[in-house]
Amino acid sequence: MNIAVTGGLGSGKSTASRLLAVAMSAEHLDTDQLCRQQMQPGNPGFAAFSQVFGSRFLSADGALNKQLLRQAVFTDSGVKNELERILHPLVREEVAEYYLHCCVTEKNLVVEIPLLFEVGWQHDFAVWVVVYVPEELCYSRVAARDGFTAEEIQRVCATQLPLSEKLKHAHYVIDNSGTFVSTVQQIAWLGKNLRAEISMGNARKTG
Ligand code: ADP
């Protein structure tokens, strides 16, 4: 079974998806991390990006200047769109290939995808889990984790579906507004439920 975990910025996707992978003895993929790997010199994302932008976002050593690119993504929708046009198909293919590997090794796969519904990849997955925390709590956790300003956080959130919309699509919701222990308990329940679904051979309808 392949399971997608999504949510808002800082809602706890990483925390919840890693716990769920442990609960199900599943493999885990983080699509943000796949994007970052694609943008390393020598990889296809970096090559395609360099063809479009030349050395505009490179440091003297030839590596990507992440700070410069991050600023451009915030302020220039042309750069953001082009980056997504390059990276999304590459990452989607990587996830599909890894799922094939999991099918062969008979493992489940948990994939963390911030923009699952926005990019329309939900039908690649059997189960859609949304991790929820109220907006104010997201903001304070992201500010503590990344040092982002409120304005930067708002700009990122403005490009995403509101969490309330994501919740409407969810097969399962994890409420991560409490303690880590509360989240662990919900994940333990979810893992058990999904394992039961698998053993009953449930074919979930994702349409
Ligand atoms: P996302 O992957 O959605 O951006 P993370 O899982 O990285 O979110 O969580 C954002 C921040 O909030 C991290 O610093 C994480 O350690 C913290 N965090 C996550 N869940 C909880 C929780 N239940 N209680 C307190 N802090 C949490």
Where in the sequence are the language-model features?
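Short beta-strand-centered segment that lines the nucleotide-binding/catalytic pocket of NTP-utilizing
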Residues: 26-39
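Walker A/P-loop
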Residues: 14
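Hydrophobic anchor at the beta1->P-loop junction of P-loop NTPases
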Residues: 5
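ATP-dependent small-molecule kinase phosphotransfer cores
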Residues: 36-107
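ATP-dependent NMP and nucleoside kinases share a basic, alpha-helical "lid"
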Residues: 94-104, 108-144
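ATP-binding Walker
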Residues: 11
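Small-molecule kinase domains that catalyze NTP-dependent phosphoryl transfer to phosphate-bearing small molecules
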Residues: 123-124, 144, 148-207
